[in-house]
Amino acid sequence: MKKRLLVLGIASILGANIAVTSAVWAEDKVEITNVSYDPTRELYEQYNKVFAEHWKEETGQEVEVTQSHGGSGKQALEVANGLEADVVTLALEYDVNAVEDAGLIEDGWIDEFPNDSSPYTSTIVFLVRKGNPKGIKNWDDLIKEDVGVITPNPKTSGGARWNYLAAWAYADKQFNGDEDKIKDFIKKLYANVLVLDSGARGATTSFVENGQGDVLIAWENEAYLSVQDYPDDYEIVTPSISILAQPSVAVVDSVVDKKGTRDVATEYLNYLYSDEEQRIAGDNYYRPSNEDILKEYADTFDLDVNLVTIDDFGGWDKAQETHFADGGVFDQIYEE
């Protein structure tokens, strides 16, 4: 069953100020839950306040948004196992598909919102200590014997899967597709990993607060937040090749239909594409999907970095099966 396309309908209803008649809108307050991945805490803390004002202005109703954060794969599993989410805003398409496979999201969710339901993007960079004492410039520096690496566990973290694939893309180019050499490179990289945290924020804590390692492989936004908070302690290195990381959003159909929150949940995700929210994303160091607004942040982001995409890996289903499923390449190289 194809997913009901309500975005335009909701927008037109709100724009025309048509009287709200549904039972849930008739109440003074509505509550929804956004189950998200690890490093979106600051983004949604700011966005939820803005959205509440928008919803109140358009409908007269107050909305309270409860947040849940953790490693993206773990969060998807929690929702599939019963954590009630009106919306999911996860690190990658595959994790939303896992919720769909559990029967909670209808087919066609990726076409529900613009840009394949990805309102903002990011990429993968290195966070190093001020002065870059180990001289880290590119992925090959991460396999040196004296370099301690921090990155999350790709079995539980969406960001960690983007990290792994970005490293693979670099090795693929360096070794002209020689899979044995690529695997050896990835094996050496993960041999240097000091701790595999379950999520990106945990990895940041290990590196920034606990002082572990020489380099953190990180979401771009997470690295910028660390530099913002500790400008005298850290700096960012952008590798020669990285990956276009595309977080995905979706309404959890089974939950909103049960609670009667489809309208507010849909508008919650739809409003992520508004100019106001696109700038909130940029201010929180996510790359806005709106190209014109992205250009406003040209002094913040390296817009010329060489980015591969998940399509270069055959899409998420193939990438997951090849690299991250039980017995996949990651298990093979990490357990050796």
Per-region residue spans from a language model:
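Alpha-to-beta junction loops
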Residues: 82-88, 146-148, 209-218
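Early extracytoplasmic/lumenal segment of secretory-pathway proteins
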Residues: 24-102, 112-113, 219
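C-terminal segment of classical bacterial N-terminal signal peptides
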Residues: 15-23
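A conserved helix-loop-strand patch within extracytoplasmic ligand-binding domains
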Residues: 100-173
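Ligand-binding pocket segment of bilobal, Venus flytrap-like solute-binding proteins
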Residues: 174-241
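Solvent-exposed loop/turn segments at secondary-structure junctions
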Residues: 39-42, 72-75, 93-97, 131-134, ...
